[in-house]
């Protein structure tokens, strides 16, 4: 494909097709199921799904079979199946994106809104613009572009789901149903839901951490009691007991997880090599891009150690505490108990079952003065290492990066989680996993002022088109 002609074509398609539809998508307040208790009845997820279906039909992708799946009790899912146009090509390429959204949060600029799209300095602002709305329209536009350029393609399938920000349970359910349709020769999987360290090259994610979320429930009193004459100094304070649990997980001197089962035995050598190359390009930008108050310093001074911390070491954070009175509601009473929600990010290649047993041991080995202390595990997602891409895919993607960004492709790890990738890998262990995206450090996904770099989006459409036509 001639790169100049392709760039010009994609520029036009982005302006007349992608951008207006993506703006309409932002206007739909379709929060992920975890954040919208009424998702089954308010029709917002279905409205977003219908927008995707309408866009796919509008593009008139040749021979595309467009399916909107709506099984009872599950969120909608869009599955598109496009047969190969190459003769005797029985390979399948699977592309993925999600169209549910995080809550809006606070702190948006006065002239910006999560559901009223704004274009400013070649960035599109609004919830879902970067995570992950652009992916759906980019993927479909790339496929149509290939057809318009008369490129012969392998079979292409698309899965667009609407529960990624909550759980992968719905996606796994549908994926298992689709396995017989997908067949046994899926050679590449492209989840377009990852990030980039800059907008000057194609970034390829080769590792993601897992996540383990759990609740620590502490019960001491059958009712609230006056903390002065009744309970103070007699009954152990709830946060003190919660801290005992936390201290069993975290080394309080340095904040590191001390449960050995949570650590990977050895970081792959290829990761060390790629980190060195990445740091040569990015340097300390990772730190500079964090919204720190003056005087706040990172846990370590060495950038490489910080990136290893973020990608290949476990962390534990407190997400919330129930039954802890707000300051404005303060009284002289001790609550009957508390529930602390904790979340661990876990490196790839660790054993979930051993970690859960180790966490249970933290409870059984500690003394809590007879208080009822229990663990409730409510969510787990596997980490994944994707270090075995074929040379053919690497070469195509690297050439595409040079053509459309002007620089070589770079591999890097991610500190976040896309648990479904590990599940896909278990079903198709020999497939190339091409995990990429254009969510940069200024995209603010999950936070206020989420935005999409529109120039990077155009380049990503070009790269997808190029890869699909060359693979």
What are these regions (language model features)?
Residues 2-105, 337, 341:
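N-terminal helical capping/dimerization or prosegment-like subdomains
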Residues 49, 88, 198-199, 258-337, ...:
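An extended, acidic, His-containing surface patch that forms the Zn2+-binding/catalytic region
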Residues 89-160, 455, 459:
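Active-site metal-coordination/substrate-binding segment of hydrolases
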Residues 99-100, 249-254, 360-370:
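A common structural junction motif
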Residues 123-124, 128-207:
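Acidic/histidine-rich catalytic neighborhood of metal-dependent amide-processing enzymes
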Residues 130, 222-224, 231, 344-352:
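A generic structural motif
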Residues 229-255:
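A short core secondary-structure module
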